[in-house]
Each structure stands twice: as structure tokens, then as C-alpha cells.
Amino acid sequence: MPTPKKGARLGGSASHQKKILSNLAASLFEHGAIKTTDAKAKTLRPYAEKLITKAKSGTVADRRNVLALIPNKDIVAYLFDELAPKFENRAGGYTRIIKLENRKGDNAPMSQISLVLEETVSAEATRAARAAASKQTADEAQVEETPAEEVTEETAAEETTEAAQADEAPAEEAPVEEKKDEEK
């Protein structure tokens, strides 16, 4: 008897696994996020990402290939017309898996798989933002340095007046000390 090479199948047979993945992908595209077991979520991720990549190209052949995998025309139309344009700037990583608590009945590990619909930030945009932030902090540092110089001038002037007062005070105290010495 030949040994299995692919590992365990979802649902037992290969045909059942195909149907499970088709239904899970349809639900994911329809709702944006679904809650399922870890094994199903990990198996669904590459399947759904390949479908989204085909939807991004938007050709008739790709649409027919996706229709062969997901037989619901409404969901395929939604995938090609509304979801694919949202992923135009993203090169991959269209889905996200978040671990949840284990299921209550059988303690199965659960996950939420969802579509990542946030806008991607290009490396150039982050560099530009960092450059703008560094320029702003440099400008603030120059603004802070100018008042600091003025403050040092004021404190220097105060120190000179205090020094002058200190010079006068020992002169006044000196005769008092001499008087004490004279009294003895």
C-alpha cells in the first residue's frame, strides 16, 4: 500500500477538501473574515491568495478559472470588480490569520482568517515621512537653541550681579570680624 505524500486531508477525501476550500473561500470573500479551525485557515490562505492574484489580472480566462473553483457567480463578480482593485498596490499577503481561543465543545484550536484591506505604505512614502520628521525635529532643535543662548546670557548677567554683591558683603563683614578681634 503506498504511503500518503501530502498528509491529512480536510474532510477525508481530496474531492471533499476541494469543496471545503471552495466554500471557505466564497465565505471569506463574501464576509471579509471568517472564524474556522487553525488547520482549515492555514490551508485556505494560499488557496484564497492565488484566487485574489488571478482576480487582480482580471482577464476572461482568469475569471473562468476562478468560476471553476468557486461556482457562485455573484461572489466571483464581487471578487473581480470590488475586491481586486483594493489589492492593486499589494504584492501579496492579502489575508491575515489571528489565533482565537479553543472551541468550547471539542477544544479545537480556532482562528480568524480575514482579508487585509488596509492601504499599503510604500518604502518611498515611509522614507519621505521620516525625512520630513527629521527636518521638523532639526528645526525645533534650532528654535530651542536660540532661547537657550538668551537664557545663558541672562544667567551670566545675574551671576555677575550676585558676584558683585558677594564682593561687597565680605567687605562689610570684615570690619565686624575686626571689631570682634579688637574686643578680645
From Swiss-Prot:
Gene: rplQ
UniProt entry tagged with the keyword Cell division: no
One BP annotation, GO: translation
SUPFAM superfamilies recorded: Prokaryotic ribosomal protein L17
GO molecular function terms listed in the Swiss-Prot or TrEMBL record: structural constituent of ribosome
Alphabetical list of PROSITE patterns matching this protein: RIBOSOMAL_L17 (PS01167)
Top-level lineage group: Bacteria
A Pfam family it matches: Ribosomal_L17
Self-association and partners: Part of the 50S ribosomal subunit. Contacts protein L32.
Disulfide bond sites: none
Compositionally biased residues, Acidic residues: 141-161
Keywords assigned: Ribonucleoprotein, Ribosomal protein
InterPro entries cross-referenced by the UniProt entry: Ribosomal_bL17, Ribosomal_bL17_CS, Ribosomal_bL17_sf
Chain intervals for the UniProt region annotation (Disordered): 126-184
Protein family (similarity comment): Belongs to the bacterial ribosomal protein bL17 family.
Gene3D superfamilies xrefs: Ribosomal protein L17
Transmembrane segments: none
Name assigned to this protein: Large ribosomal subunit protein bL17
GO cellular component: cytosolic large ribosomal subunit
Record organism: Corynebacterium efficiens (strain DSM 44549 / YS-314 / AJ 12310 / JCM 11189 / NBRC 100395)
